[in-house]
């Protein structure tokens, strides 16, 4: 693009310089030394060159429009001739004006070439943006819709997973609650059994104490009975000894008596002896039977007390074993209960954390969706702004195209005003101008873009241009 712009710039500048040099040679001829007769030729050609340069650019035509010949009246040139110094000064002024106009024309051509290059660059950007916009129109809404639908499906799937996980956790929680209630009920039953066992143990201890007291009392009774039996045995033995002594003494006496007494007395003594022996044997047998009965009763009572004591000890040991087993079971149930409660708290905390994470994820996805919507809205605003810029650029391009066509039409018009000019050899005599001020209407068009809408305002301005009297008097 820069090469084409530079080529167009060089072509237009070369064309204008060739036209200007050709019109200069046609009007003024080759640059020989000036003569007094060439003054009228140069002075008359100033108006034609002013017309030619007035068609070169809007600025030069606006600036040099005041030098056009007035509609009413014409300058009358006297027959006097100017001297060589005046022709020299006019020629220098004309050359300076021509050089300034050529420089301004060159600058305007450069600016115009830059504008053309900028317009081409903006047209390329506009075409690229149109392609991107068409691609974005064709793809991005569907893609954004697909992304939104996919994210919504993922969110729904995550919500379903969360719902199922929540239901599962609730079922587990209900099961754990039921297990906990059963364990609590079992713990209460075991606690009640333990209390009953402890109460029975207290009663058994009381019974054991009573049995111990009874046993001690019975042992004391047994000891007293044994002492009594021993005393009775001793008494019986003493009685037996006394009886034996008495019997022996009686036998001795009987022998002595038998020797002296009659046989009737011996028989009587023998009867008495037999009676006493029967009484002694009967007393001994009764004492032995009483002793045996008492001993049997005491043995039976001791055996009964011993059996009751043994049963009480056995029941006490069994109660102790039951209490120990129940205590161990209660401790185990307490540990299980604490573990279940801890697991329940951990599950609740984990569920709360997961729910918070899912809520944060849902909020993040909603925020991303909102950002995507904002970005889409921003892209649409940028696209609208680009459309506005494109519209403004199209308007500017059309304006520059019209200006360029007008300039080219002005340049291509053949110069006929040079032949109609009469070459005078006299110094012009100034007459009062009928219209010293020329009026010019200027159309000002302003193009603005407000809120995506193009606003075009036009205004007309009346411009007054005074003739340069010093320039006119210089003729």
Swiss-Prot record:
What is the superkingdom listed in this entry's lineage?
Eukaryota
Biased composition regions of type Low complexity, renumbered to the chain: 14-26
The record's tissue-specificity note reads: Expressed in the sciatic nerve and at very low levels in the central nervous system (at protein level). Expressed in the spinal cord, in the sciatic nerve at the level of the dorsal root ganglion and in trigeminal nerves (at protein level). Expressed in the cranial nerves in the hindbrain, including the sensory and motor trigeminal neurons, the mesencephalic trigeminal neurons, the spinal trigeminal neurons, and in the facial nerve (at protein level). Expressed in the cerebellum, with expression in the inferior cerebellar peduncle and the lateral deep cerebellar nucleus (at protein level).
Question: Which residue intervals make up region (Coil 1B)?
Answer: 148-243
Question: By what name is this protein known?
Answer: Peripherin
**A single GO molecular function term of this UniProt record:** structural molecule activity
Listed GO CC annotations: axon; C-fiber; intermediate filament; neurofilament; neuronal cell body; perikaryon; photoreceptor outer segment; photoreceptor outer segment membrane
Which residues are reported to carry the modification Phosphotyrosine? 475
Q: Where is this region: Disordered?
A: 1-42, 453-475
Q: Which organism is it from?
A: Mus musculus
- Spell out the residue ranges making up region: Linker 2: 244-266
